[in-house]
A protein has these predicted regions:
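A ligand-binding cleft/hinge motif common to bilobed small-molecule-binding domains
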Residues: 31-40, 85-88, 112-141
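Ligand-binding clefts/hinges and TM-proximal coupling segments of bilobed small-molecule sensing domains
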Residues: 81-96, 133-135, 156, 163-190
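Short helix-initiation/N-cap motifs at beta->coil->alpha
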Residues: 6-18, 61, 78-80, 94-108, ...
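Hydrophobic residues within well-ordered alpha-helices
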Residues: 19-20, 69, 106-107, 147, ...
Length: 190
C-alpha cells in the first residue's frame, strides 16, 4: 500500500466509534462481517473464516449446546457478535474487555459460559494447556472476518486493501500466518 501504519490499541467496544470519528482508517481485530455492520461500513474481502465456540468449565455438564444458555450468565465483549449470540439464546451477558478476563471469570465459576472465536480458545489453550475449561459446541457456519472501513464513493483505499489481501492469499502468506498463530489455516472456507 505504500504507507507506514500507526497501530492504536483500544477496547473492543470503542473500535467502531474510533473508526466513525476518523481516529482510525480501518479496524484489524478479527471483525466479523454482519448485515448490521455492512449498513455502515465497507468491508474488504474476508481474510479469515472462524466459528463461534461455546466454552464452559470442565466440570460443567449442564451446558452442551447454545440452546442451554437460556437463563445462564456469560461474559463477552460489549457490542460483539458473541454477546449478541449469547443474548439471542437467552443468556444474561456481563460486558468484559478481554478474553483473559472472560476465562478468569469462567474458571472461577462466576459465569456459566462464554463464547468466542474457536481459534482464540485454541490459542489460549496452546499457551495454557491446563486451563479449566472445555469447548462444548460451535456454530456450523463460518463467520467471515474482514477489515471494515468507512463507506465512501472513493473506493481506492478499499480496493488497495483488497489487492493486498489477495496478494497475501495468492503467495501463501495468509495461510502461513494463520497456521503460525492459530494452529490451522483460517484463510479459506475449506
Amino acid at each position: 500500500l505504500g504507507v507506514e501504519p500507526e497501530y492504536v490499541e483500544s477496547d473492543w467496544d470503542s473500535l467502531f466509534a474510533g473508526l466513525d470519528a476518523g481516529r482510525y482508517d480501518m479496524v484489524c481485530n478479527g471483525v466479523e462481517v454482519t448485515e448490521e455492520r455492512a449498513k455502515t461500513y465497507a468491508f474488504t474481502t474476508p481474510y479469515g473464516y472462524i466459528h463461534t465456540a461455546l466454552a464452559v468449565r470442565k466440570d460443567n455438564t449442564d451446558i452442551t449446546s447454545f440452546e442451554d444458555l437460556k437463563g445462564k450468565t456469560t461474559a463477552n465483549s460489549l457490542a460483539s457478535t458473541y454477546m449478541e449470540l449469547a443474548e439471542s439464546y437467552g443468556a444474561t451477558v456481563q460486558g468484559i474487555d478481554t478474553l483473559e478476563e472472560t476465562i478468569q471469570l469462567l474458571t472461577a465459576g462466576r459465569i456459566d459460559a462464554t463464547l468466542n472465536a474457536d481459534v482464540s480458545f485454541y490459542d489460549y489453550l496452546n499457551v495454557h494447556p491446563d486451563a479449566d475449561f472445555k469447548l462444548v459446541a460451535q456454530t456450523a457456519e463460518a463467520s467471515h472476518v474482514a477489515i471494515p472501513v468507512l463507506k465512501s464513493e472513493d473506493t481506492a483505499y478499499l480496493d488497495a486493501l483488497n489487492t493486498a489481501i489477495e496478494e497475501l492469499r495468492a503467495d501463501g502468506t495468509l495461510k502461513t500466518l494463520s497456521e503460525k498463530y492459530f494452529g490451522q489455516d483460517i484463510s479459506s472456507e475449506n
